[in-house]
Amino acid sequence: MSHLTDLPPWAALLVCGLMLVGAATTLIGSLGLLRLPDFYARLHAPTIATSGGTILLCLASILCFAVLQSRWVFHEVLIIFFVTVTTPVTLMLLGQATLYRDRFEEQQGVPRKQKPAPGEE
């Protein structure tokens, strides 16, 4: 027997909406990771879309279990905290490491470390 039958209709609609939007946002972030042309563009998809989708899914879980059990769910709050803190920091470090490598290899299209002097452009 599922406890979800005890969920009030207003909460069920809100949980369903949050889950659908969160799943769609996560899917868009994952597709962006696959479809974007280069590494630097691919960094934005998991940072923004996948993190946002995960947060929406956790909010749906918080709402569902808070209504069913009449208590706050702490695990999802920790997940939201760690996703919002670790994902951007990790991808920023990956981006900086890739930029350093590309500058070291002198690849075309990589921005310079410093602005060029006035006659050097």
From Swiss-Prot:
A Pfam family it matches: PhaG_MnhG_YufB
The main place the protein resides is membrane
Report the transmembrane regions from the record: 10-32, 45-67, 72-94
The answer to whether keyword Ligase applies is no
Q: Which InterPro entries match?
A: PhaG_MnhG_YufB (IPR005133)
Indicate how the chain sits in the lipid bilayer: Multi-pass membrane protein
**What is this protein's record name?**
Probable K(+)/H(+) antiporter subunit G
Give the organism's phylogenetic lineage: Bacteria, Pseudomonadati, Pseudomonadota, Alphaproteobacteria, Hyphomicrobiales
Query: Which gene codes for it?
Result: phaG
